[in-house]
Amino acid sequence: MIGDMEITKGEDIKSYALEVGYKKQEKDLFRVSIVDKELNQEQIILRNDAGVFVVTPSLNQIFKFEGNWPLNSPKPYLLQSIVEIAQKKEAKVEKEDDGYLVSSRVHYPNNKNFYREEIMFDKEAKVKWLQIYNKDDVAELKIAFKKVKYDAPIKDTYFDVPQTLDKKASVSAIQEEDLPLYPMMLHGAQLTNTSRMNINGKVKHVLEYSGDANFTVVQMKKDSVEKTQTVIMPGQMIDVLDMVGFYDGNHVSAIYDNVEFTVFSEDLSPDEMMSVITSMQVAVMK
């Protein structure tokens, strides 16, 4: 399936090109490509017989995870999730001139704002578009599918992990001088201290928060490596559509626009720590 995806966070709207491939076999194969149109940065998530991989050409790195992605939680762009929603008992189906409109309450564990979803199918039951709304009935996610083929023949090599990555020219919106970014999602905490550390020529920015929940944010600009690297990632992968993070013990890390964000906390859940990181995309606060 090929389409365009829009994610709205407050006044910020991000546009992505989306391509999803799936092949059913003893161990199902998946490939999801998400390209940030503004930054021209691509991230590919693969599942094959060797495991789960997040391919990040802008850093020339491949991250390998354990786990059952993507079937461990629903994903709006997955046909399996779309069908599951359409088949819910409480789903409402309305016949339209050009197909069928399905509407249902939804629950996405990694996207707690998502409340209600509409899915439009054509007369041949091919999905045309979907929109997900929050409790205020504001659309936070839109996907318009341009090409949909069920049971299309796909070669196994489509799901192979690339040995070398093509570092396409990309635009980085976040520069070193923009750091640190400040999260909007604070979980009842307030900023109590900021500091900088210089480690091996790299600057790490540290933000400490205290209150209902205590947590620390560390952020650092990442440089692309010369030779393609595969990095084995410990812990649990967390996928929030436009960003992939991993949880290991008391912290969650994620890379966005070549900046590595890490949240340390004994009080926040993995999803709450990830929500702190994703809230930094909305605005640069000084």
Describe these PLM feature segments.
Residues 32, 130-132, 263:
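Beta-strand-dense domains in secreted/periplasmic systems and polymorphic toxin scaffolds
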Residues 1-13, 30-32:
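A short, Trp-centered hydrophobic/proline-enriched beta-strand micro-motif
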Residues 137, 144-146, 150-154, 262-286:
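Surface-exposed amphipathic alpha-helical segments
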Residues 97-163:
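Gly/Pro-enriched, hydrophobic low-complexity segments
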Residues 47-111, 115, 154, 159:
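Flexible, processing/modification-adjacent segments and terminal tails
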Residues 21-76, 134, 138-147:
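An acidic-aromatic
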Residues 162-257:
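Short, solvent-exposed recognition patches
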Residues 13-18, 39-42, 112-117, 139-142, ...:
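Short, surface-exposed coil-to-beta transition loops
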